[in-house]
Structure formats: C-alpha cells, structure tokens
Amino acid sequence: MDWRSDAAQNRDAWTKANAEYTDRNALASWTGDPHWGVWQIRDSELGVIGDVTGLDAVELGCGTAYVSAWLARAGARPVGVDITPAQLATARRCMAETGIEFPLVEADGADTGLPDASADLVISEYGASIWVDPYRWIPEAARLLRPGGRLVFMCNSTISILCAPDGDERATTTLQRPQRGMRRFDWGEEGVDFQIAHGERIELLRANGLEIERLLELYAPEGATTHEYYGFVTAEWARQWPAEEIWVARKR
C-alpha cells in the first residue's frame, strides 16, 4: 500500500474528527497544563517533557498543535507539522486567541522538509507516532535531531491493540489478533494507524541511532471515566492493563 493513500485516508479521518471534537476542545488544551493521553495525566506527575527553555523542537503530527503551544509557553521554539489543513486552521485560530505563535508546516510527518539536525526535541503525542509507518517517521525524527537531542512520543499500548476487535469496538479482555506481524491497521473511516511490538520498536530506534531512556506504561487513574470521544478502551479496562505508552529516546 502506497503511503500517500494512507495519508489521504488519515487526512479525511482527522478532518472529520476536527469537526466533531478537536476544534471545539483545542483552546482548552492550548491553555491548560501539559498532560498526556486520554486520561490527561499531567506531565508534572510523569516528568517527561522536562526543561525545554531555549530548545528547538519539532512536533510530528501536531494536529491542533496544543503540545507545541505548551512547549512555546515553556520557552522552547517549536515547529508544528501536520497533513490536515482543518487542524492547522484550528491551530492558527488558537494562536490568534492566545497570542502564542510558532511556525506550522503542512507536511507528512515522515517528509517534513525541515533541515537536518535542526531540533533538540522531536515530540509526538498520538501524531506521526501512530498515524505514520514507524519505518518512515522514526528515521525522519532521527534525521531532524541533533546529537544528544531527545525523541519523545506516545502511542497505543501493544496489549490494547492485541485486544482490539476489528471495527470500532472497544478493547476486550481477550486477545483478538496475533502479535506476530502486527504493523498496519486499517480502521476504515477512522483512518490507518501503525503499531509494532516492543522488540521491533527497540531494534528500529537503535538502528536509527536512538538510545532508549524511558518507557512509561500508562493506566487509567482511579476515578477516571471513559473518554467521551476516544473510547478505544474503557476506564475499567485501562485500570487493569496499560492503554498507552510514552517512549523517550536520545540521539547518539
């Protein structure tokens, strides 16, 4: 399957999602405390982003660019990259309403057109990290990073994908698919995403000059409720198994 076809399908899916959910919630995300995933676990609890003062950053698959907004507020110089014009338009509206400004680039997360070694931080929270083939976007992230720079990204957990039925049903408590060979998942109108097993991801990161520093497996906190829009797992399920992962790696 040509990546351009997948990108077009994902652009359509996120244009729809922006109309249904992300546009009306973008401003609150821009102005809120930095947080991760569907359970909105604060970065202050996880300690992932750290001190970014003066750093050049690239967000791959930025969507409405709230992560880039957090970085800009913290003193970084972010660039947001996304393929969906509707979401970039929402990001520009949020810029106008908040006064927070940074460059936005309409491009594929694995073909940004940005210069080599131009970033101290490459970050993706459910952006290119799942919507672009990792064999395309991870080499691009490595190309963008300077030596010593960090790659930080969030994706679905492996166990949540293995327990996810075909279609739009939520993860179950039984395995629904084999782990061997997992990579590309076509969810129809919901888009095409990419998930690989831990061992394969470790090999891919290391092959691109990236040393893994942390892997965080996130569970739903006590009192969390199932997300109103991103309901791929229930809160009850995610209190028992991790639904999301954050990876942190550093460029050699």
Where are these regions (language model features)?
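Conserved alpha-helix/loop element of class I SAM-dependent methyltransferases that forms part
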Residues: 26-55
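N-terminal, positively charged/glycine-rich alpha-helical extensions of SAM-dependent methyltransferases
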Residues: 1-28, 32
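Class I SAM-dependent methyltransferase SAM/SAH-binding core
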Residues: 56-111
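Conserved class I S-adenosyl-L-methionine
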Residues: 150-183
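Short alpha-helix
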Residues: 191-215
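A short glycine-rich, Lys/Arg-flanked "PGG" loop and its adjoining helix->strand segment in the class I
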Residues: 135-150
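A short SAM/SAH-binding and catalytic strip from SAM-dependent methyltransferases
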Residues: 121-135
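A short acidic, Gly/Pro-enriched loop at the edge of an enzyme's catalytic core
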Residues: 110-121
